Amino acid sequence: MEQRKVHGMNRRLGLAGLLGASGLVLSGCTVAPPDNGFFHALRMGWPQGITPEAQELGNFWVWVWVAAWIIGIIMWTLMFVVIFRDSDKARKRRGDNEEFPRQTGYNVPLELGLTTLPVLIIMVLFFFNVPVQDKATALDKDPKVTVDVTGFQWNWKFGYGEINSELMPNNQNYDGVDEQAQKLAEDSQYELREGQEVGPIHGKSAEDYSYLNFNKIETVGSTEEIPILVLPSKTAIEFNLASSDVVHSFWVPEFLFKRDVFPHPEQNRSERRFQVEEINEEGAFVGRCAEMCGTYHAMMNFEVRVVSPEDFTRYIDYRQKHPEAPNSEALEAIGVDPYAVTTSPFVTDRQGTRDESSDINRNSQN
């Protein structure tokens, strides 16, 4: 009887230790993990975040893995202890000649503990998960730049909706809406015949593009050139997303965050906006479509080019003064690579392949 009491106390202490260790580890979810190889391996391929939101998401991911490993090691240890402790050989060595090991079924305290403990661990996990998620999806910043993103099969269009005066060459707030193009889009929403709305969608046209944004400064991708979205560092930015056809997804891996890009986002009950507090690293970062959207989905890439606020002002100045110039000229004017360096365009021309195949066939016949 005394031995059973000791075993019961050990179980309780073990469970309490497990809960305490898990809580202690998870309590550090917002703290950056040590910068060493072990913690880098725990990122499981996640890149280092370049926004405060991404850094918190990355920290949470790593510490959850640490907690999972601690719990896993404890559970595997307990399992192997029981396996070897209650093997026939071990029991005979102890002088236990019973047919079966001592059974612990219907042990109410143990069953309650093993039911309560996982629930508590999940509660702790959610306690730290919710603030990180809220930070990533919050729309509480004061964005200095608003970027209008339009996805289409199979490329991207980027435009600047608003830019704060701090980043403008004339020190005045910039409203980038192309009024003429916007009016044409708004006029497209209704099909009228003899003064009646005859569109197939509650009177609206199937070619309704009134929900899209059209800007004076835009960059449009093509099969020859990857679209480059130029953004300032150390600046709050808002992204306003919409698709002109099917569902896409705007994903920059270093943001550790993606958001689906819907046609008619309001009607689809989709949040079309997200914000970042700042981008704290300059450089080139690849962006991708993360939603299967058709034949060339895998080639629907873009590049985010993060420059200093001063270079961003120079870039906007060049785009305003040379509205017909390609984006590559504006990039070259501020002294950076004019074309994408993180990804390449997918050439859809098959003529070269056909010619090569013909040569191979002719050679084989000879």
Feature locations, PLM:
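Central hydrophobic cores of alpha-helical transmembrane segments in multi-pass inner-membrane proteins
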Residues: 74-85
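Non-transmembrane, membrane-proximal soluble domains of secreted or membrane proteins
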Residues: 30-60, 83-366
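Hydrophobic alpha-helical segments
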Residues: 2-75
